[in-house]
Amino acid sequence: EDLDEEDILLRNKCRKMSDDELNSIVPVWATDVRKMELPINHPMYSNRIFMQCNVDKLIKNSTNLYDVVFNKKFDGFWHDESRFANTIERWLNKECVDPPMWDISQNKSFIISDGRHRTVLAQYIGVKDIIVSIPIYLKEDAQELLEANELIEK
């Protein structure tokens, strides 16, 4: 993997973080359309809604997380290290990150179609509930399986 100096410094910063420091991170989710990287997924422009759900239940009820590994050592031996380090840095700086997207796959299983690493990272740092973007037609499934509650747009 080719790393620039900024990536190396960021990984080194994360490598030095204690478990207590990691657990004190508060995720900041972008629900304001102006702050989203992919605003096309905002309820204003899509058939999606934001819901707050239990992260453990989200992971348990999503079938496509088998290859997502979070190794807190930041030792350069795992391919998604930069994704985790960049998300940690953004959250430390109180910068918004798009919520994960929960969908149903072609074989009718539930998946996280975007934001798998953000989801696993949130669980690792001890977050109980996260915000997810789901299609309106999965609202009842989310309420039942994920203990989800719809966020009211302000």
Tell where the protein language model's regions lie, with residue ranges.
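Short alpha-helix boundary/capping and kink motifs at helix termini
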Residues: 1-16, 20, 25, 41-111
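Solvent-exposed functional surfaces
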Residues: 7-35, 127-129, 141-154
